[in-house]
Amino acid sequence: MTHPKELPFSTLQFYATAPYPCSYLDGRQARSQVATPSHLINADVYSELVKSGFRRSGIFTYRPYCDGCQACTPVRIKVADFIPNRSQRRAQAKHSDLQTSVTKLTYLAEHYDLYLRYQTARHAGGGMDQDSREQYAQFLLQSKVNTRLVEFREDDGTLRMVSIIDVLDDGLSSVYTFYDPEPPNASYGTYNILWQIAQAKALQMPYIYLGYWIKESPKMSYKTNFQPLEALQQGEWTPLPVVDPAATR
């Protein structure tokens, strides 16, 4: 592993994007801070950037940089202290027979078809349900860091879920997961996070990075179901108290 003093942070540049419509809070404008150049952001550098609140989309490494808004809060699960609740144990038992296959980033039409079905069912009208093959590949199949693609299949080979995961020096970063939208209450997403937690435990890694949590966004509320959760606030990772979903309505 590269020593932190050897990482090329002094040669990285950071710039702010122009404002664009926020994907999570209606009527808000968002901005991002982008780390460049991408060819210097290897696995070691990216691990350090994630600890500072960055994420990636393809080879685009960014963090929220919005004017007058700090709603996006980076969160991570403390793996060693996690204890599943009753509904999570049900999801674990329900899908324990799924067969997993961990591979390098590869395009398969079967994956792309499942991606479109997922987007159409879960995020219709948001734009991603119209993603071309090229847009899908740029979003999920381009990476300069240590990334894995994980398939989840039934015994008969039916594809149920695909997850893109980055391997960091202190944990796993959940990049994106898409799954069969039918039936709607199958809890595939919950099972996926439980699977990642189990993988991190096996690798003796302390954290699962879940990206950003927004208190006012119902789409993000599932993340607080995985406790204990830490949040990056004012430059420090501190415990995030359990949030009552009713309090955000």
From Swiss-Prot:
Provide one Gene Ontology biological process annotation: ubiquitin-dependent protein catabolic process via the N-end rule pathway
Name the catalysed reactions: N-terminal L-glutamyl-[protein] + L-leucyl-tRNA(Leu) = N-terminal L-leucyl-L-glutamyl-[protein] + tRNA(Leu) + H(+); N-terminal L-aspartyl-[protein] + L-leucyl-tRNA(Leu) = N-terminal L-leucyl-L-aspartyl-[protein] + tRNA(Leu) + H(+)
Q: Write the Enzyme Commission number(s) for this entry.
A: 2.3.2.29
The entry's localization annotation reads: Cytoplasm
Show the GO cellular component annotation of the record: cytoplasm
Keywords on record: Acyltransferase, Cytoplasm, Transferase
EC top class, as a word? transferase
A GO term, aspect molecular function: arginyl-tRNA--protein transferase activity
Q: What is this protein called?
A: Aspartate/glutamate leucyltransferase
